[in-house]
């Protein structure tokens, strides 16, 4: 399911048009993104937790030349599903 399909599904469940449902979905994504940018965790009970995780610096290899390179430390968004979500997926 892509973003457009998600908007259509949410709008259908709310009984509104896609045009009316789109801003709600957009605002949820924007709010989660802003929270992660500011270093906050976003926990949704029964669904999961979005957070930013630190990736340590490491050595890598250039696949074309085989030369060893340094890969700097970075931050990456991560999602940890809640037990209820895991159980719901397993039950299908």
From Swiss-Prot:
Any GO MF annotation of the entry: DNA binding
Keyword terms, alphabetized: DNA condensation, DNA-binding, Phosphoprotein
Region (Disordered): 55-77
InterPro entries associated with the record: Hist_DNA-bd (IPR000119), Histone-like_DNA-bd_CS (IPR020816), IHF-like_DNA-bd_dom_sf (IPR010992)
Pfam family of the protein (one): Bac_DNA_binding
GO cellular component terms, A-Z: cytosol
Gene3D superfamilies: IHF-like DNA-binding proteins
GO biological process: chromosome condensation
Modification Phosphothreonine occurs at: 4
Subunit structure: Homodimer.
Family: Belongs to the bacterial histone-like protein family.
UniProt function note: Histone-like DNA-binding protein which is capable of wrapping DNA to stabilize it, and thus to prevent its denaturation under extreme environmental conditions.
Name under which the protein is recorded: SPbeta prophage-derived DNA-binding protein HU 2
Species this chain originates from: Bacillus subtilis (strain 168)
């Amino acid at each position: 399911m892509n973003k457009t399909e998600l908007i259509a599904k949410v709008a259908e469940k709310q009984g509104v048009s896609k045009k009316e449902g789109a801003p709600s979905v957009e605002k949820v994504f924007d709010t989660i993104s802003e929270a992660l940018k500011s270093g906050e965790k976003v926990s949704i009970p029964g669904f999961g937790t979005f957070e930013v995780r630190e990736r340590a610096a490491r050595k890598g290899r250039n696949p074309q030349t085989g030369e060893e390179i340094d890969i700097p430390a970075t931050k990456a968004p991560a999602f940890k599903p809640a037990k209820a979500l895991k159980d719901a997926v397993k039950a299908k």
